């Protein structure tokens, strides 16, 4: 039941709010107002202070939830402002403190696999991401007042330059509330992946070839009707631990380069690649 799912998410969240040491300082989480399906998350790399702001939508029922992620900060792992299915990780939510396990798992490809000497960890990139989150998303301070700090001279100019170079319109900016309100709540139907034969259900967190999909499982399909924000079906990307690829998309989208890579085409390839469909 959806009620059981939100109750479990709330319980998990309250636990590590009471015990912040359990997060190891790697993430900060807040629900979107009173909506316990939608979560604001700041992933944090404590050695460099690099942060990535993202949204998680967790819906369905407590036995077979679906997970949709949208990164709001430029990064070298996931495309910005694109919806990515993380439903292949839904088995983590079945555990005690499952929300914490899920967040730890998402944290790893963002920071852990790449060496700290890489471009995305340079001081200028850390400065850029801090400025981006606070300038583009005005509600950032509402959800994470403890992270605000102060902007520095030049912050507005680097954010404006990056937006222009990557054709990111101001419609992506403003408050997160405005950002989310651009999607309409309506009824959708989707085919959830079948995890009944998932060999990783009881495995430890780690890099694997777990496949995720929302609509290409032809065996024992289970159809869920739900009311959710419309981004659930807009250019959805499927993701496993090794790759990202489109599920339903009218056109392909390239992952945005890191800020330091804007003018530096070195031909180096990130470990996250697209699969050709």
UniProtKB/Swiss-Prot annotation:
Segments of this protein annotated with the region Disordered: 254-277
Function in brief: Not known; its elevated expression suppresses the conditional cell cycle defects associated with UBC3/CDC34 mutations.
GO annotation, biological process: protein export from nucleus; protein ubiquitination
Gene: UBS1
Lineage: Eukaryota, Fungi, Dikarya, Ascomycota, Saccharomycotina
Entry protein name: Ubiquitin-conjugating enzyme suppressor 1
Cellular component GO terms, alphabetical: nucleus
